[in-house]
Structure formats: C-alpha cells, structure tokens
Amino acid sequence: MTDTASRQAPLHAPNDALTDVAGLRVGHARLSGPGALSGTTVVLAPEGGAIAAVDVRGGGPGTRETDALDPRNLVQRIEAVVLTGGSAYGLESASGVMAWLEEQGRGVPVGREPGQVVPVVPAACVFDLGRGGDWRARPDASTGRAAVEAAARTEPGAPVEEGNVGAGTGAVVGPLKGGVGTASTVLPGGATVAALVVANAVGSAVDPDTGALYGQYFTGERPALPSPEVHTAALRRLAETYDKYGASPLNTTLAVVATDAELTRAQAQKLAGTAHDGIARAVRPVHLLNDGDTVFALATGARPLDPHPLALNAVLAAGADVVTRAIVRAVLAARTVTGPGGDFLSYQELYGTLAD
C-alpha cells in the first residue's frame, strides 16, 4: 500500500452509520416525564467484544472505566460503550448495561464456572442538567438497560436514529440544539470506518461570517450558504435567546469511532487520538476546561489490515473525516426544543431548507 493509495477517495457505506461496521448495534433511551430532557445511547459490540481504546482531551471529563482501556492494562476487549446525559450522575446508566451483559454471560471471565464474568463497560457523559427544567431528571441504571436492550433488538446493519435521541436528547452546540449524528465510509482497500457522536459543545458549529456549518467545509462538498438576510435573522434570534437564558457553562462532545479492520490496542489508541481532529474541524473552540471531549475507538478485527507500516494512515484519516461528518449530521438532524429549561433553537429552524 502506498501513501497515494491511502489518499484515494473513500465511499459512503450503505447506511452512512456506525452500524455499517458489521456487528455493531446502537440503542437509544430517553427519560420520560415533565422536565426531563436527557437520555443514554449504547454501542453494543459483537459477542466476544471488540478491541477498544479512548482518548480524553476535554478539561472537564466525566468518564467510567477508561483506565481499563490503557494498552498497558489487562482488559483486551469490551462488550459495550455507554454515552449518556446527566453529567457525572448519568454514569450510573452504565450499571444497567453491566447487569444486562452479565445476564448474557458477556464480559471478562474471572471465575471457574461459565457466566462468572465481569463486564467492563466504559462510559462518558455530557452535561445537560436542568435543560428540561428538572435538575434531578437524569439517566440511571434503568435508562442504560433500556438503551442496551434497544440495541440488542436491532437487526444487523440497521439504520441509526439521529438528532434529539438518546444521549443527544438534551444536547446543545454553542447556541444551537445539538444531538446524535453518525457517518461511515468504505476505504479503497475495503475496510469500513464509521463514527457516532453526541454533539454537545461549548464552541459553535456555525461560521459566524457565513452561517455555514464549519464541518461542511471539510466534507468534500461545497457548503450551501444562506442569504445574508437569513443569516442576519438567525443571529438576531440566537442573540435574543442568549440574552434570555445565557449560555450553558459546561458541555462535552463524545464520539465512538469504529472500524472492521484488525487493529492492535496501540493502533486503536492512535485512532481515538486522531479522531479528535474531526471534532476540531466541526466545532470551534474545542477541548476547553469546561468541555469533556472524549473519543472511544473500537476495532472488530473482521478484516486484516495491510501489513505495510503506513497502512493505518488511511484508517486514521477516515476516522477524523467521519467524526466531522457525524457532527454536521447531528446538528442538521436536531430539532428545536422549548420548555421550562430554555429554548434551544435548531439549525433547521433558523436556516430552513438550507439544512435539508
């Protein structure tokens, strides 16, 4: 494999979603009831698990079991990753996923009898406390169980719901409503690389000079720019909302980037790190002290990686690209939410058909 080959144009996979990596499933659950605007998303690996890694670059992360993914440590494969709202309180949702996996006998074998396992369930949270009006409405173990059960019910390769779902239910990006987004690509060599994000950032996804989404400049297609009149009206409405409610002090963008290529744990660690470039292209600024930006990497190992020393480059580049596209899709899929916790306007509402 040459460096030129690594730069050949990739193709979008069938669903343009994380589930295009064979064996991965995604499930969402959200809180119900008045004042609730939060939820949990679970990425379920194939039975037997996937090689996993993590890279945390935000200054205010909320995570669980990320140390287990260090390549120097014992755990080789994990069965699920949890992305959740509720800030650090919401990490309790991973307990529900852990209990479900134990019932399936899935986890690290630690006992003499079959089924005596400890499921390692890495998790990360976004800040969305109070956005529905009820500060105490946050995901718990039952929310996590509902999300993993939803993932297990899906068919292989099923489309992934985007927008105001799961951990993206109460997400915001700068002044705009955020949410869940996903994207995938097939490399010239045949490997699939995909991402799922929860876009919930302190920084903005919108170029203030044009109204285009920053990430659209990196998708290979020329952004459709709004008219100056539409953009001016959008800025005015956002300013009015800011004056009324202020800005959220804490946020986080989360991502799971995955591939069917056979990666070592060290290679997966590199993939998690370079995938952060995709966040930086789509959101400005990123990785601040009040962000908890975290990227997980999963490798199912179904497809051997070319042994050439630079073969990983194509996977690394694609990982950043699909994270950028997933953030764009999250913002475009989000819908306006109004309620006692605030008014969170969507890009779709502000810019209309331009967002289609």
Question: Where do the model's predicted regions map?
Answer:
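A structural signal for small-residue-enriched, beta-sheet-centric alpha/beta enzyme cores
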Residues: 2-95, 99-356
